[in-house]
Amino acid sequence: MNNITNAQNPFFGQYQTPHATVPFDRIKTEHYEPAILEGIKQQNAEIDAIILNPEKANFNNTIEAFEESGELLDRVVSVFGNMLSAETNDDLQELAQKIMPLLSEHSNNITLNEKLFARVKEVYDQKETLQLTQEQSQLLENAYNSFVRHGANLEGEAREEYRKLTTELSKLTLDFSENNLKETNSYQMLLTKKESLAGLPEIIVEAAAETAKSEGKEGWAFTLHAPSYVPFMTYADNRDLRHRLYMAYNTKCTHDNEFNNIDIVKKIANTRMKIAQLLGYKDYAEYTLKRRMAENSRAVYKLLNQLLEAYTPTAEAEYKDVQELARLEQGNDFIIMPWDWSYYSNKLKDKKFNINEEMLRPYFELEQVKKGVFGLAEKLYGITFRKNTEIPVYHKEVEAYEVFDKDGQFLAILYTDFHPRLGKRAGAWMTSYKEQWIDKKTGENSRPHISVVMNFTKPTENKPALLTFNEVETFLHEFGHSLHGMFANSTYKSLSGTNVYWDFVELPSQIMENFAIEKDFLNTFARHYQTGEVLPDELIQRLVDASNFNVAYACLRQISFGLLDMAWYTRNVPFEGDVKVYEQEAWKKAQILPVVKETCMSTQFSHIFAGGYSAGYYSYKWAEVLDADAFSLFKQKGIFNQDVA
């Protein structure tokens, strides 16, 4: 591995690609480790230079110099981390087990470096007299707080304990993610009788047949990936099969196998609690919320409980309506279980509004939706998108676009990655391969490279990729995040784009979701993939009318996730109990459907155990409150109004 020369390793030197994009076509697994080790070495040398600078510590020679350090390491780690989520394999995951502790150790070596912190503190203590710009003040504030929040004020045994705990945590979160992906990929429900498929739309049956065929099997294979799981739960008439698939999904990482996350959940929660207490906080939520708009757990609980009170009566009425419909079909003793909810909700929606996802799907062909979403950005901001096949990508399904601003200046690179794969984790997210910053020496505005990653319905042999309305909303959501990243315009990369308070970060994404039911927007792209017919006004009106169908139940579900998150991270004593029982107690006031004791959300709740949302899941609802206010201006002034945008 270490025989690779710098010249052979694509991470070294300048990328010879359009806009210096990542040369994915040249990167192999063996390139990561030597580049990361060299990146650590280079940043250590840069930090030594800051410490050994004979000049008195000032903003330029300490704060800015630290901000600019670690360029090679950042470059490699951004690719490595993103590949672990979007295009991983056994070799990469094995390497991650070796690399992640090294990165944790390196991070600790920086924040626990007493001489470096002394210089940072020296500048911070003079902040009132330095006449800094607003950006410079923010950078200084962030740098100082980051050191303090990562153990710089700890001494002796406490410092060593902090090192130990943070290294353990990096391994635990990695294991959690890997187990989740492997457990998801390991399950398949193979059906061999045609009658088992009753109720399922043709496109779903075709996709299941292709999944089975790709593995040399006869029949129809259904998986735990959203484009397979969600339609099955919504349309399959066979209740026993819905039950089977539901249980497979909702007991992920709880089984007696190597993918079990029960102990890992306990360890992550306990380790975060210990880190927070070591740093002087009563619990992990208090530690996290100190740097959020919400500021403390009282404000979070106030929001969650207010919303809980507001949603519950309507959600209970929604449940009653669905239950009544089910009893008309199944008899008065029938009790709706969680594996029945989507099925009967969909039937009721169809009955009330004469609309369902499959009715809309032919109008949402992926290429057309993409044109519509890109066109919306063009109308609002004047930006344009140009596909560039010369830009290397990490998988044949990924596309790369150059994005230009209204003056025709290069703005950003946008990668799009739409469909599920074995090496891709579940969900949808926006990420970056390169942040934006302004080069101090040349004045050049170095533009960002952004990616949106989804798990949308795949094309089949007979049909293009036809999205559900829910997938269209998801596209708009993640595209909102990408706009936030692409419009970044800061001097410093650590302040640019989505590097904002976490409970603000969901605002741009949720504003974009609002466009999904706007007739003027839908008319720009929604065409039947076979006939070219525009989405009829009558269908749009039904879509608008149905947009609040069972919305209270859906909101209550989000509240339940927020309550579960806070239950794990407001603990101030270690947890040694039963994870499933604790979970059921934590969110019981937000549950309307009967509890299924064997199920567990925590073991697969990547947002709070492996992502950035620990003690932060409430931020979706926080941003919704802000977003309702913000979008009302578009409604008032016109949805394509550039002045509002």
Per-segment meaning from a language model:
Residues N3-L200, E206, F634:
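N-terminal helix-rich structural modules
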Residues I4-H31, E38, S214, G219-A221, ...:
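C-terminal, non-catalytic "cap/extension" segments appended to globular domains
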Residues Q16-H31, F80-I99, E122-K164, T223-D263, ...:
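Short His/Asp/Glu-rich catalytic/ion-coordination signatures at enzyme active sites or charged loops
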Residues K41, A45, A49-K56, L72-N89, ...:
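Intrinsically disordered or highly flexible coil/loop and linker segments, enriched in small
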Residues I51-E55, M83-T88, A236, R244-L245, ...:
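Membrane-interfacial helix termini and the short, flexible loops that connect transmembrane helices
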Residues L72-N82, E141, N145, M247, ...:
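Short, hydrophobic/amphipathic alpha-helical patches that form generic packing surfaces
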Residues E135, L139, R163, E168-K171, ...:
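Active-site-proximal, well-structured secondary-structure segments within enzyme catalytic domains
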Residues E365, F456-L476:
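Short pre-active-site segment immediately N-terminal to the catalytic Zn-binding motif
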